[in-house]
Amino acid sequence: MIFEHEIPSGSKLYFGESAKVKRDIEYVSSEILDNLGFEEIVTPLFSYHQHESFDDKKPLVRLNDEENNEVTLRADSTADVVRIVTKRLGRSTESKKWFYNQPTVTFPTTEQYQIGAEIIDGSFEEIARTTITLLNEIDTQPVMQIANIRIPHLLNEKYGVSLEVLKSMHVEQIMAADLPWIDQLARLHSVDDLNDLSAFPDDIKEELKKIKEATKKVEYANMVISPLFYAKMRYYDSLTFRMFENNTLLATGGIYTIDGVEAAGFALYTDECISSKMSKEEDK
């Protein structure tokens, strides 16, 4: 039996202080992004093309329009923003920097509020620094973990290391690879660990250099590297970052390609930021 006051699992309810914190985070972030030259965009909740961004269609909430064409509720803002800006708005706008403040919805009843931004032809360091600026403004300095998705793909394609093993971080299985440098690769953690890359083959070394250059340009004190990090990401294909406070993921971002368009972007997870801010207020 479902009572009248019940809300579906995974959906969000904010009221009183939590609603105020949500409003403050969204307002401050929007003002900062506007001052940094980003244009705001609100994309439709309904989409004809979300399924093109998902290999696994299970997260999509699907329904049909009046002509029985399949539509889905917005499960990913990034792909829609890039496609709308480049293919629908086209020459009607010269801006390459866009931000949004809107939720995503995934099956069965999960809502996630996000503040995100995309820069067409953007750089990793600009999008990373922008994310840091927003998080600083809401009084949090999480750990930034930088990775390069190309490294796991090279390990899989050229050196026989399974992506599933990397995804699950089975260290023993990774170490079992007959590669004299794999142990050293797994031990890379701090920015200083990138000072000597002589042990690695040229292709791996080249991708590690990209991480090294990114750390120099971003200039953030609370930073670690994770060259073996792998997750099945829909369009990220090179440098990525994740920002954690304790074990809570507050933001992700990086550089990516969608429909041949190269861009950089991030998503700040508003719900987690609200919890973080309220927890700190309670501790005072």
Model regions: which residues?
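Positively charged, Gly/Ser-enriched RNA/tRNA-binding surfaces
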Residues: 18-39, 47-48, 78-80, 85-89, ...
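Short, surface-exposed amphipathic charged segments that create phosphate/polyanion-binding patches used
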Residues: 158-163, 239-242
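A conserved hydrophobic position in a structured secondary element of the catalytic/binding core
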Residues: 73, 146-147, 268
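Acidic, His- and aromatic-enriched active-site or binding-groove loops in soluble protein domains
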Residues: 61-65, 160-177
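TRNA-binding/sensing appendages of the translation machinery
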Residues: 1-70
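Beta-rich nucleic-acid/ligand-interaction surfaces
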Residues: 42-60, 147-157, 222-224, 228-238
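Extended cationic-aromatic binding surfaces that line active-site or macromolecule-binding grooves
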Residues: 67-82
